[in-house]
């Protein structure tokens, strides 16, 4: 067992990597190219496309942060990406509060909305609310508040995970990253309007929009009690 078990594990891992990794890598690259092309659209449509696509990438078992880093996603497109990621994380966290209570709120709101993937596979309609929320907050970020994420590009794909997305926006205000400076960004003193936009787009609006849209989905019978339950999260001590 000491020899066979590690050998089998290594061989299976290598075989799967050889057969499965290439198509997964190709799909991820294609997805990244779609996001890259979306950044060339007008601010309104770019806000919708980038917000929705990067938000979806955040919840999928792929790395939205890596995609944003590779694409060097900063500026107004980075702001839209932050909006989309926050919509997914805060949206799922708040609209599933009834099922998951405080443990689910923290694990999804500050951790990752990827925890909902098993539920999404079972019932894809649970994904409607946070995705539509991201389609709303994205253009609000780009067209109303002109929210830019000029910190490290990786923060564009982090959302509220450890508050990295919000911190990236703030650091971009006071000390833009090299990638952002190369695109013309400069340090600035954020105004109250800037802070209001960040808080509304990243936290308040997703916390309101996603539950409201999910309520409509529930009334239509698309989402039922228990569809958003996180079986793997232990939150007894947080109740």
Regions found by a protein language model. Name each.
Residues 2-7, 23-38, 182-186, 232-233:
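Hydrophobic transmembrane alpha-helices of multi-pass solute/ion transporters
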Residues 6, 10-22, 52-64, 84, ...:
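Transmembrane alpha-helical segments of multi-pass membrane transport proteins and ion-pumping complexes
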Residues 53-56, 84-125, 132, 136, ...:
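Alpha-helical membrane segments and immediately flanking helix-loop junctions
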Residues 236-237:
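Conserved small/polar residues in nucleotide/adenosyl-binding loops
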């Amino acid at each position: 067992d000491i020899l066979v078990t590690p050998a089998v594990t290594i061989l299976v891992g290598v075989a799967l990597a050889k057969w499965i990794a290439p198509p997964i890598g190709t799909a991820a690259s294609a997805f990244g190219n779609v996001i890259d092309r979306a950044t060339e659209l007008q601010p309104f449509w770019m806000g919708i496309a980038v917000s929705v696509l990067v938000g979806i990438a955040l919840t999928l078992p792929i790395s939205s942060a890596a995609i944003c880093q590779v694409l060097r996603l900063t500026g107004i497109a980075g702001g839209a990406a932050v909006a989309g990621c926050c919509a997914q994380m805060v949206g799922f966290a708040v609209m599933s509060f009834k099922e998951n209570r405080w443990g689910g709120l923290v694990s999804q709101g500050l951790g990752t909305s990827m925890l909902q993937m098993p539920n999404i596979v079972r019932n894809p309609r649970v994904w409607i609310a946070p995705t539509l929320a991201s389609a709303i907050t994205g253009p609000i970020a780009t067209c109303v508040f002109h929210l830019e994420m000029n910190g490290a590009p990786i923060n564009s794909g982090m959302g509220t995970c450890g508050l990295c997305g919000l911190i990236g926006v703030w650091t971009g205000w006071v000390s833009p990253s090299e990638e952002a400076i190369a695109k013309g960004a400069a340090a600035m003193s954020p105004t109250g309007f800037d802070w209001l936009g960040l808080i509304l787009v990243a936290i308040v609006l997703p916390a309101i929009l996603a539950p409201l849209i999910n309520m409509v989905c529930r009334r239509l019978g698309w989402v039922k009690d228990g569809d958003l339950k996180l079986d793997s999260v232990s939150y007894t001590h947080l109740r």
